[in-house]
């Protein structure tokens, strides 16, 4: 007789306090040793809220035994520093988290222009999270537990009414038609096109925001999936959206070229429902033998053109999306990144 995890019949709850089980996972010759023998650099712990701090620390010790500079990222949906969890607060086991807590308001900001929610969570993160955690958070396009990125920005079935029990998570789309419908549903071409433009703006923000720009496999080529489990389709080798792929490659190239973004300080300069401006400051002043001070990112989240005000004689545009260079305006749902020397 087995207990089910969250009442899912094929998910068996294991005894986390069992010494035999702990040894099976963390002991010499155990599962973690086997994984590192395959050449991995670290692990992501799923549903850390259901594990004890002691067990997570055992897993960290097993990782450290194999690779002293291992990386452990924890899946947690809340602010772990308010949950009195030692696995993250002592810095000895988990190094960082999946950034559900901030990715939710970022998606809400783009879809619903909810600047209040975004400002609240940005303030909380910068005030309560250590820099080492902020710099290594997984800022994801989507994950295995939510609809695909392109579906999240299609605004179909998107509900966030005040007082709704799902108010906290923007990826809880309406489920009125059931799993069979979800498994075969494809976005209409016009909706897909509009959603694609929005996800590019999402990519732009994640590129310059502190943390790891994390792409859930398939999001880079436009994989669709409404809800869980439709989001877990195999990679569409013969149906690749080259436009999305090209955009993400451009964004990732920026991350590689401007290495100071990994540890740059962040300041929010403006945040309204229509406009989001932040800067990343180069503390070391040098990167690849080039001197520059910072990058300013200007996002037009509104529906009208936005004059570009932050560019001066000492700056140059290094990335743009929906930007009219002739008239020096950012078009609706566009963005510009300015390198300041």
Residue ranges of model-derived segments:
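Aromatic/acidic polysaccharide-binding cleft in carbohydrate-active enzymes
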Residues: 138-185, 203-242
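Active-site-proximal helices and loops of the catalytic beta/alpha 8
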Residues: 30-33, 41-140, 205, 222-250, ...
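Carbohydrate-binding surface patches
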Residues: 269-312
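Solvent-exposed beta-hairpin/edge-strand motifs
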Residues: 311-323
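Substrate-binding/active-site clefts of carbohydrate-active enzymes
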Residues: 1-38, 59, 65, 82
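The substrate-binding groove and active-site-proximal loops of carbohydrate-active enzymes
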Residues: 7-24, 40-50, 106-113, 183-195, ...
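A structural motif
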Residues: 37-40, 211
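C-terminal beta-strand-rich structural cap/linker in extracellular carbohydrate-active enzymes
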Residues: 325-341
């Amino acid at each position: 007789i087995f207990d089910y995890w969250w009442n899912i019949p094929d998910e068996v709850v294991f005894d986390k306090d069992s010494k035999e089980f702990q040894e099976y996972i963390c002991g010499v010759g155990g599962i973690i040793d086997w994984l590192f023998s395959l050449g991995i650099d670290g692990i992501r712990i799923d549903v850390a809220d259901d594990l004890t701090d002691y067990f997570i620390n055992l897993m960290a010790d097993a990782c450290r035994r194999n690779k002293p500079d291992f990386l452990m990222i924890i899946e947690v949906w809340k602010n772990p520093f308010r949950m009195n969890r030692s696995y993250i607060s002592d810095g000895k086991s988990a190094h960082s988290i999946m950034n559900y807590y901030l990715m939710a308001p970022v998606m809400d900001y783009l879809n619903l222009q909810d600047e209040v929610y975004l400002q609240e969570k940005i303030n909380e993160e910068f005030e309560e999270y250590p820099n080492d955690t902020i710099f290594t958070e997984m800022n994801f396009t989507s994950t295995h537990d939510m609809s695909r990125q392109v579906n999240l920005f299609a605004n179909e079935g998107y509900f966030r009414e005040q007082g709704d029990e799902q108010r906290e998570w923007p990826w809880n789309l309406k489920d009125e038609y059931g799993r069979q419908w979800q498994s075969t549903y494809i976005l209409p071409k016009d909706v897909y096109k509009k959603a694609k433009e929005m996800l590019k703006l999402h990519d732009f923000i994640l590129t310059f925001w502190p943390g790891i720009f994390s792409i859930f496999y398939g999001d880079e080529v436009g994989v669709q999936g409404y809800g869980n489990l439709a989001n877990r389709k195999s990679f569409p080798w013969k149906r690749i959206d080259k436009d999305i792929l090209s955009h993400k490659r451009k964004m990732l190239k920026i991350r590689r070229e401007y290495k100071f973004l990994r540890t740059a300080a962040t300041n929010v300069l403006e945040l309204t429902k229509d406009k989001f401006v932040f800067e990343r400051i180069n503390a070391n002043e040098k990167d690849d033998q080039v001197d520059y001070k910072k990058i300013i990112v200007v996002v037009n989240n509104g529906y009208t053109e936005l004059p570009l005000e932050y560019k001066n004689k000492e700056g140059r545009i290094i990335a743009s999306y929906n930007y009219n260079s002739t008239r020096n305006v950012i078009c609706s749902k566009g963005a510009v990144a300015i390198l300041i020397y």
